[in-house]
Amino acid sequence: MFPSLTSDPERPQLPDRDFESSISTSNADLDDLMLSTNGAPDGKLNGRAPSGTSNVTGESYAAAAAAAAAEANERDGKEDPNNGEKRYADAVADTDVDNTGRHDQWSYPELPITAHPKSIKTGSWRAGGIRFAPLRVPMRRRLQTAAVLFHCMSIATFVSAFWLICANPLAWPIIIIYLIHLALSTAGTNGNLTYRSEWVRSLKLWKLFTGYFPMKLHKTHELPTDRKYILGYHPHGIISHGAFAAFGTNALGFRELFPGITNTLLTLDSNFRLPFYRDYIMLHGLQSVSKESIWNLLSKGGPSNDGRGRAVTIVVGGARESLEAQPGSLRLILKSRKGFVKMALRTGADLVPVIGFGENDLYDQLSPKTHPLVHRIQMIFLKVFKFTVPALHGRGVLNYDVGLMPYRRPVNIVIGRPIRVDKAHGPQPGQQDIDELHERYVQEIEKLWDAYKDQFAADRKAELEIFA
C-alpha cells in the first residue's frame, strides 16, 4: 500500500478548486487557507443544479406516471413469451424502478455545497525553486498535517516497531508466541469483527485527518437495514485515502448517515501478515478482500445473524488502477472486474456505486503514456509481487513542492443508489446474470459521475473513461 516512490520533475500542476468563486489557487496558497462550509440556500447550488438532475414539472410527472400505468396494464394483458419466467435483469428492473415509472426519468438529488478553501494572502517563501510554508500557521493545520503523516507512514512505523522489539532478547518468547498467532489467525477472514474498535475508529486523530484535505461523505439514498450491501469505491487513487476515511473510520459520519449498517473496508490479504500493522488495521474494522472473507461477512452477523445490516466496501480497480491515477481525470478498470458482482449474486447483496471525486488529485505521478518504459517495469512488478510501485510525488511536511504527503485538495465521496439483487443465486451464478448485473452497475457509475461531475470535478481535464 505504501511503496517506495520517485518524483516527477515535470509534474502537471492542478489548481485547487474554489467552488464559490471559481478562482484557482496554488498549492502554496491552499496550505495556509482556513476552511469554511457554506450551505446552498433553498437547496440550490449557486443557482444551478448538478448535471443529470431533471427539470420535469409536476404535471409532466403525472402524465408520465399515467402513461406508464397504461403501458403496464397493456403489458399485463399480454401473454409472457417466456411462460412467466423473466430474465434476472428484467426481474430486478421491475423491483428497482423509481416512482416515476421509468428508469430514464430518474435522476440523482441535489447535494449541498461542501467545505471548500477560501482565497487569502499567504506568507510562503521560496528557496532553490521550492516553496516553503510560513512559520506562522494555525496549530490546527499543523495537527492535520501530523495526522496525515502518521497514516501515510503507518506501515513503516508499526513494522519498524516490531523489529525494534525483536532487538531485545527478553522479548523473544513473546515475539515467538505472537508470530505463531500471526501465522494461524483467521481474524482477517472469519467475518467476526472481534478486533473492531469503535473507540479507535472515532479518535480525534481521524477528524484532523479528514480536515486536512478536506473530505466529505455525501448520501443520496437510504440503505435499509434489512438488506446487505457491497459498495464499490472508485477510483483507487494512489493510496485510497478517501475510502479509508469514509469506511475505515467514523470521521465522516457513515454510521450517522446510515444507522444500523455495519460497513467493513476490505484490503489485500497480505496486509494481515505484517506484524503489528495487521492489528492496527483490524482495530479499524478492516478485513481481507478474499472471497472467503466477503462470504463470511455477508452470510453471518447483523441483528438476524444472516448478514443483513452489514456492508463491505471494495476498492474495485485495485493496484493496477493506481497507475492510472492522474489529476483531473477518472480512468477506471471496471470492464474486466466482475468478481465483486459474482459475490453480490452469491450472497444476495445489493450493489452500491461510490465515487470519490478528487481522489486522483491528491498526488502527481508519471503518466503511462509519456513514460512507457517506467510503466512496463511497474506492470512486471505488479505481476510478480501482486502490488505496484507508483512513480509519484506530492508535497512535503514544511514545503509545497517536494515530498510524499498528499496535496490539500478536496475529496467528496458520493454514495450512489443501491442496485437491488433479488435473491442469493448460489455458489455459481450464471454468466448471463453476472454480465447483466455488471452492465447495470457500469451504467449506474456513469450516471453518478454525470450527476455530480460539474459540482465536484469542475476543473477536470477529461471525462470518465472505463478502459479495461
State where each predicted segment sits.
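Pol beta-like nucleotidyltransferase catalytic core
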Residues: 411-414, 423-425, 433-449
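Structured cytosolic regulatory/catalytic domains appended to multi-pass membrane proteins
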Residues: 307-311, 318-321, 438, 442, ...
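Cytosol/nucleoplasm-facing, intrinsically disordered, low-complexity tails
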Residues: 1-118
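Membrane-anchoring hydrophobic helices of lipid-metabolizing enzymes
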Residues: 46, 73-292
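Soluble catalytic domains of membrane acyltransferases
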Residues: 2-6, 29, 201-204, 208-415, ...
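Catalytic cores of transferase enzymes with a strong primary signal for eukaryotic protein kinases
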Residues: 281, 407, 446, 450, ...
